A protein has these predicted regions:
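Short N-terminal or domain-adjacent regulatory/targeting segments
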Residues: 1-12
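ADP-ribose/adenylate-binding Rossmann-like module
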Residues: 100-122
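Glycine-rich, highly charged phosphate/nucleotide-binding loops
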Residues: 1-2, 54-76, 82-94
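Short, acidic/turn-prone active-site loops that include or flank metal/cofactor-
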Residues: 48-49, 65-66, 110-114, 133-138
Length: 147
């Protein structure tokens, strides 16, 4: 995505689901989630071993659960799916996103992670795709105030 597209997406986005949001505060996914919450985003945790809540928010065990009609009735549509999974898992994640009834506008894959197949799957389905890019660092860069 070009900078203007990222900026527009981040300005309009309200709900960010984070796949792989660890309850461990030392993990990058948790640091990013806390930052996004501080910026006013509603973060929806998705973690396979979720047990109740992460960061005071209801945690979901799977994409299907987080993107279900019941879950979305609480928050509305999910704008961005931020993915913290290994590059090898991204194709399966993209295929899973395609099977969702309620799809995100964007799949954002964290810094150091990339998969051409996943990118093609999402883009061919009309879903924005950003990879090898930290949403926290991009938000800071795009919206930092210069004196």
């Amino acid at each position: 995505m070009q900078d203007f597209e990222k900026k527009q997406l981040l300005q309009k986005a309200k709900n960010v689901a984070i796949l792989g949001l660890s309850p461990d505060e030392s993990k990058a996914s948790n640091v990013v989630a806390r930052y996004l919450i501080a910026q006013g985003f509603n973060v929806i945790p998705i973690y396979p071993r979720a047990n109740g809540e992460i960061l005071g928010r209801k945690a979901y065990a799977s994409l299907q659960e987080a993107f279900s009609d019941e879950a979305l009735s609480e928050c509305g549509e999910i704008d961005i799916l931020n993915v913290f999974r290994k590059s090898e898992a991204l194709r399966a994640v993209a295929n899973e996103v395609l099977r969702l009834k309620n799809k995100p506008k964007c799949v954002w894959v964290q810094l150091g992670l990339f998969n051409e197949n996943a990118k093609a799957i999402c883009e061919n389905a009309g879903i924005l795709y950003e990879e090898n890019s930290c949403i926290k660092l991009e938000f800071e860069r795009l919206f930092s105030k210069v004196d």
